Amino acid sequence: MIYYVIALFVIAIDQISKWLIVKNMELGTSIPIIDNVLYITSHRNRGAAWGILENKMWFFYIITVVFVVFIVFYMKKYAKTDKLLGISLGLILGGAIGNFIDRVFRQEVVDFIHVYIFSYNYPVFNIADSALCIGVVLIIIQTLLEGKKAKE
């Protein structure tokens, strides 16, 4: 299925980008891309977003495995008839596995995309995080559109 190819693409880009950061940047260093907006910053995270649940790797292992099984089941059941859902789940699956690989092999997640939004220093993130968020946003949009159609 094409949706698994999307997941594999996300995993590949995520892992290659993280490898490049680890091999070429010292931890904590930053390269400005757009001053005061976008930086490439070598950062490590031993928790989830904003560092919550730091050093709780077993929790993340269990949750991720359960989550991945659920996503694969859901993809097999519903993605055949719903392309947007399939794309969304492919992005989510790739993102979940990308960060899982880091947790298993590094005991931390490599983050490097550093954004300032209206002077707010947003937590550093990575390609897997982006894919997860985009997938979730697409599902929310689809749900809202379906709700609107049902009302008509």
Swiss-Prot record:
Its main location: membrane. It catalyses: Release of signal peptides from bacterial membrane prolipoproteins. Hydrolyzes -Xaa-Yaa-Zaa-|-(S,diacylglyceryl)Cys-, in which Xaa is hydrophobic (preferably Leu), and Yaa (Ala or Ser) and Zaa (Gly or Ala) have small, neutral side chains. The keyword Ribosomal protein does not apply. InterPro entries: Peptidase_A8. GO terms for molecular function: aspartic-type endopeptidase activity. It is found in: Cell membrane. It is an enzyme of class 3 (hydrolase). GO terms for cellular component: plasma membrane. The active site is at 111, 129. It is a multi-pass membrane protein. Keywords: Aspartyl protease, Cell membrane, Hydrolase, Membrane, Protease, Transmembrane, Transmembrane helix. Pathway: Protein modification; lipoprotein biosynthesis (signal peptide cleavage). The chain crosses the membrane at residues 55-75, 85-105, 124-144. HAMAP family: LspA. Belongs to the peptidase A8 family. PANTHER family: LIPOPROTEIN SIGNAL PEPTIDASE (PTHR33695:SF1). This protein specifically catalyzes the removal of signal peptides from prolipoproteins. This is Lipoprotein signal peptidase. The lineage of its organism: Bacteria, Bacillati, Bacillota, Bacilli, Bacillales.
